[in-house]
A protein has these predicted regions:
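Short internal alpha-helix immediately C-terminal to a glycine-rich phosphate-binding loop
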Residues: 1-41
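Short, flexible, glycine-rich and Lys/Arg-enriched loop motifs at helix boundaries
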Residues: 13-20, 71-85, 142-143, 163-164
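Residues at the starts of beta-strands that form the adenosine-phosphate
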Residues: 21, 45-46, 109, 134
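Short, well-ordered alpha-helical microsegments
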Residues: 32, 56, 97-98, 120-121, ...
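Terminal peptide-recognition signature
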Residues: 39, 59, 88, 100, ...
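Adenosine-nucleotide cofactor-binding segment
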Residues: 40-95
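Glycine-rich phosphate-binding loop and adjacent beta-alpha segment
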Residues: 95-161, 196-197
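C-terminal hydrophobic helical "lid"/dimerization subdomain
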Residues: 146-198
Length: 198
């Protein structure tokens, strides 16, 4: 939810200029799935990035307008590419972020809540200096109580919790040992919660 409000902030920063096209990476993961749901409910055209071709229907059901293969964000990037994205929720980070920044439109906001693709990026100043792109780190664990209360009040309006239940799994510590290799291979989707009392 914090990511979605970061993207929405572009409208306030640019005095009402409307956000239209929003990119969400790691779209089948827990954060990506919820971001798609929220951003589509906010009225944006959500473009979901995934490497899991069997999840297209799942992503469309969450509200994605378009599905993009993550391979589109591999390889070398120019200093600046055609501006495509008004906003981005990048749960992946790493090498793909370089290309994403180069493709973000003037004044665009890239919210970065994760680093599943790596902690390093190889970028340049051009997206920031020429286009005024903003890269916002999202740290939900360090948010104030006031901010958390605001977010949870908004969550009730923007999140379909019955859908969240369909992609959330609860595991015991013992079950985690079986699931962890799949996580490392990128074979999991949705949200996995470890319940120490299970």
């Amino acid at each position: 939810l914090l990511c979605s409000f970061a993207v929405k902030a572009k409208e306030e920063l640019l005095l009402g200029e409307k956000v239209k096209d929003v990119l969400v990476t790691g779209a089948t993961g827990g954060v990506g799935s919820i971001a798609i749901m929220i951003l589509s409910k906010m009225g944006y055209d959500v473009h979901a990035v995934t490497g899991k071709k069997d999840k297209n229907d799942y992503l469309k059901d969450l509200g994605a307008k378009n599905i993009i293969d993550r391979k589109e964000f591999e390889g070398e990037s120019k200093l600046l590419e055609k501006g495509v994205w008004d906003g981005v929720v990048d749960t992946v980070g790493g090498a793909a972020l370089t290309k994403i920044l180069a493709q973000t439109k003037p004044g665009g906001i890239v919210a970065l809540p994760g680093n599943a693709g790596g902690i390093k990026i190889n970028t340049n100043c051009m997206p920031f200096v020429i286009r005024g792109v903003k890269l916002w780190g999202i740290d939900s664990s360090g948010s104030s109580i006031k901010r958390r209360e605001f977010v949870w009040n908004e969550a009730a309006k923007l999140i379909d919790f019955s859908k969240v239940q369909t992609f959330t799994k609860e595991l015991s510590f013992n079950e985690l040992l079986d699931v962890y290799p799949k996580l490392l291979k990128g074979e999991l989707s949705g949200r996995t919660i470890v319940n120490p009392n299970k």
